[in-house]
């Protein structure tokens, strides 16, 4: 039991370092993806591209989330593995989960992670949206307190977006202007996205691996990973777009609820809007796996334990 706990702590350490490194290195893709998703139809891409200095705005929020999420992931998954696996011997060792038990453990762990990171995702979105706003335009806008969106119509005026550049001021502003609800916006879309992520990734990876099982080489592993990432992004991007919109600073006056958000995007902006930012998300997802695995392996070696155990 002592060795098992020691290995778990080492896994958490290696996983946390890998998660923070991966989040930082791929954050420009996250910024561009979120920035595109926040733009209404007809907004030029050039509005986002030149703001290179802003490419790491909001990264601190996701790094805090990545650290906490990693701890939660290992502890939750470890507990679920013990709960779902009946093949536990006297030394309290258990065989790896397979099939539906693995899918259940992964999905439940993903939901717990998602609930944890929702406040940080909201902070990130607030900071990115703020970084994209022209300060001169903000001075002309006045806040609208009672504006409400109906199911079919947008509010006549929307709440202006504040210009905030740092983590703690963002948290303070969100609480003062929107209350505690500001940190749980987009919860429904986030949970659905996580369930879809886990299910599609598990299914797609298994399918592509079986399809290429005759080719037992590095190339097949790369192809499987890329094909899985492409499938994941293609099928879950609409949920991701809705999640981002529901986390925006003016979501409360723009959208009545998640379904209203989906409806209005479809009617007012067109079907293609649901796949905004998909290229950058694919780049992030494709690179993230390799970065995380590589850093995790190296930190595992430094800590003196096998990352495959």
Swiss-Prot record:
Keyword terms, alphabetized? Membrane, Mitochondrion, Mitochondrion inner membrane, Repeat, Transmembrane, Transmembrane helix, Transport
Where is it located?
Mitochondrion inner membrane
Is Coiled coil a UniProt keyword of this protein? Answer: no
The record's annotation in Pfam families points to:
Mito_carr
Its membrane topology is listed as:
Multi-pass membrane protein
One GO cellular component this record assigns the protein to is:
mitochondrion
The residue intervals holding the Solcar repeats read 6-83, 97-211, 216-302
Q: Which residues cross the membrane?
A: 12-32, 47-67, 100-120, 184-204, 222-242, 285-305
Q: Which domain of life is it from?
A: Eukaryota
Q: Which cysteines share a disulfide bond?
A: none
Name one molecular function that GO assigns to this entry.
Answer: citrate secondary active transmembrane transporter activity
Q: Which residues form the signal peptide?
A: none
Which processes are annotated in GO (biological process)? mitochondrial citrate transmembrane transport; mitochondrial transport
Q: Which InterPro entries match?
A: Mit_carrier, Mitochondrial_sb/sol_carrier, Mt_carrier_dom_sf, TXTP-like
What the record says about family reads: Belongs to the mitochondrial carrier (TC 2.A.29) family.
Q: What is this protein called?
A: Uncharacterized mitochondrial carrier YFR045W
- Species name: Saccharomyces cerevisiae (strain ATCC 204508 / S288c) (Baker's yeast)
